[in-house]
Curated annotation (Swiss-Prot):
Its EC number is 7.1.1.2. The chain crosses the membrane at residues 1-21, 29-49, 61-81. The lineage of its organism: Eukaryota, Metazoa, Chordata, Craniata, Vertebrata. Its main location: mitochondrion. InterPro entries: NADH_UbQ_OxRdtase_chain4L/K, NUOK/Mnh_C1-like. It catalyses: a ubiquinone + NADH + 5 H(+)(in) = a ubiquinol + NAD(+) + 4 H(+)(out). Pfam families: Oxidored_q2. It is an enzyme of class 7 (translocase). One of its GO terms (biological process) is ATP synthesis coupled electron transport. Keywords: Electron transport, Membrane, Mitochondrion, Mitochondrion inner membrane, NAD, Respiratory chain, Translocase, Transmembrane, Transmembrane helix, Transport, Ubiquinone. This is NADH-ubiquinone oxidoreductase chain 4L. It comes from Balaenoptera omurai (Omura's baleen whale).
């Protein structure tokens, strides 16, 4: 395993630990999820470049599309919760149930 792969896996692990530790605020959880998605994107792109597997060239782009959709939905939910309750606590999401 090269140093680049270890750095990317370390970034993914740090984002995962951050998500598990700071899960009380929605904004910090969204930032950690975004860090995880970006490290997965870089890892997928490096793996495809190193293996010369041409059929999987679209996988990093599809991963970026899913990350953009996740970020847009998360930010919309953050704006709605902060406008409604005045805080960005994840506990406020339980109050949105019908």
């Amino acid at each position: 395993m090269t140093l680049i792969h270890m750095n990317i896996l370390m970034a993914f692990s740090m984002s995962l630990v951050g998500l598990l530790m700071y899960r009380s605020h929605l904004m910090s959880a969204l930032l950690c999820l975004e860090g995880m998605m970006l490290s997965l994107f870089i890892l997928a792109a490096l793996t495809i470049l190193n293996s010369h597997f041409t059929l999987a060239n679209m996988m990093p782009i599809i991963l970026l599309v899913f990350a953009a959709c996740e970020a847009a939905i998360g930010l919309a939910l953050l704006v709605m919760v902060s406008n409604t309750y005045g805080t960005d606590y994840v506990q406020s999401l339980n109050l949105l149930q019908c």
